[in-house]
């Protein structure tokens, strides 16, 4: 896909829930969405406590507004640790189930080429990553809602159960440069190896699965 990096001279919208979310038309995002049981509550609370202490010590009221130096430290200290918690394999890990993973993949690919362009993506046992470029005037939040809502319906139906499947708030990061894009591509492609997985994952690019193990 044609990559357009974040442009600081172009209007940017930042909204915040528990995490900051940057939005700018025409850019690419690194998205991580996790299952509701993927991080135990006590570990999630500890992560948030340490993050809030760091923000207070750095006199930062909003992590969406950081200097470049502080942003790099923030991602080292908290973004990386957040992903380490996911890779620890907590929870039921239903996406290691071939049928459940396939239903999520179908939802990821449903809008590819129309509502958005998918670059590299990876289905892990309790979360997934994707590099995605929304089409013009298609909000990223709407894309993620379709992914989560559709796959939740399909997977719950397959497993014959009800209830929340996904954690409410996803993690997304606006890609700022070609170098960062390549970094995220490598991270996604290597995530199964980093997590020590030999089965139960799928790595793809666009509409094609590049590496499938255990499915």
Describe the function of each predicted region.
Residues 1-215:
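Short catalytic/metal-binding and nucleic-acid-binding patches
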